[in-house]
Amino acid sequence: MARRFDRRKFLIYGSATFGTSIFLKACGSSPSSTTTTSPTSAASTGASSGNTIKVGILHSLSGTMAISEKSVVDAEQMAIAEINQAGGVLGKQIEAILEDGASDWPTFAEKATKLIDQDKVTTIFGCWTSASRKAVLPVFEQKNHMLWYPVQYEGQECSKNIFYTGAAPNQQIEPSVDWLLQNKGKEFFLVGSDYVFPRTANTIIKAQLQAKGGKMVGEDYLPLGSTEVTAIITKIKQALPNGGVIYNTLNGDSNVAFFKQLQGAGLGPDKYPSMSVSIAEEEVKAIGTDYLKGHYAAWNYFQTVDGPTNKKFVDAFKAKYGSDRVTNDPMEAAYIAVYLWKQAVEKAKTADDLEKVRAAALGQTFAAPEGEVTLENNHHLAKFVRIGEVGDNGLFKIVYASDKAVAPVPWNQFVADTKGFACDWSDPAKGGRFKTT
């Protein structure tokens, strides 16, 4: 198991500058709670007593996923600081309690339980990998609590207890495959980390390729965080001797080794263009621009999105954390999540009654850095679709952008088992999965 950080509490208040004061109260780890909660008891949390409203932040601050998740925490804390500076929520300041999931899925479940049972938070912003989300999902459903999940994922899920502010497959994976088929070739080698997101994503990609005249020539996986990539690169060269598309769903530190050795093996983007769905500006910076220049990524947001709302977001982030920092899609989705929660709480006129907050969240809109987004009845966002190419400066040149926000489709329509299904939490009779045809 990866090393765990001690519990930390961040009480974030606004100050006279953009700058905020962050009062850090470091505490030793508490013993695991043995409190049990009935499936409906969390409908009223009682976590907003006094002058503060407690929320949880649960991401990997250590282990292989820290390369990606630390920056998401920064974005969530920035949103909280902005809200507190502007007067808070319902006249109260937000108190954020931060926990480290340590890139270990049982730890995520343990920390989610602690945040709900011991810290009595009103909601949690957290997770990155689908494995961590799947680990905490039973906790949120059994305790009838609320998670805001900020990362693109494989779909095939629609929980009452989760709001998904990252992309569904039809807002990232599917349009990127279409773009590759039109612009880069028909033969695909699929490489991913060995857990639920890459395997489910590749199931979708294979079904889409079959439906649209593409061909999957190879598929291989690495344990999450593994840097033993030589065998996979050899397989790619054998399966695509004359070049072809590499579709990459690796996560964490594996990407560092993969792209360095890919270049070392002579598999450059001119003949072997890769499309990644978990590499954004932060990862490009960590891996090195020289290794990623000319490769592609599909997201809803890039730092290079042109517009005043994004400029304000980027400028604020750099002012708070340093001019050398970059923004990326999961950070933007996490930032959106905090504001959508705030708006839902204000509409519901309570942070504690989670049923009212859930109902109030549906239909909320937000002028996000990517463009205006809407929280649909299926607990997913209507979002813009973009594809970017890594440039010399480590940022993405946008080569494709949708004209408008694309409605989310959680249940994939290329996969036979879920074709014709949808989700609608505004109607209890429909709920998380119902047949439309």
Predicted feature residues:
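Bacterial lipoprotein signal-peptidase II cleavage site
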Residues: 27-37
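Extracytoplasmic "Venus flytrap"
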Residues: 56-75, 99-106, 128, 194-199, ...
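Beta-alpha junction/loop-to-helix N-cap segments that form part of ligand/metal-binding clefts
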Residues: 67-72, 86-156, 165, 222-226
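Extracellular/periplasmic Venus flytrap/periplasmic-binding protein
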Residues: 110, 154-155, 160-265, 304-312
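Extracellular/periplasmic periplasmic-binding protein-like sensory domains
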Residues: 262-335, 346-352, 402-436
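Solvent-exposed, acidic/polar segments of extracytosolic/periplasmic ligand-binding ectodomains
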Residues: 362, 368-437
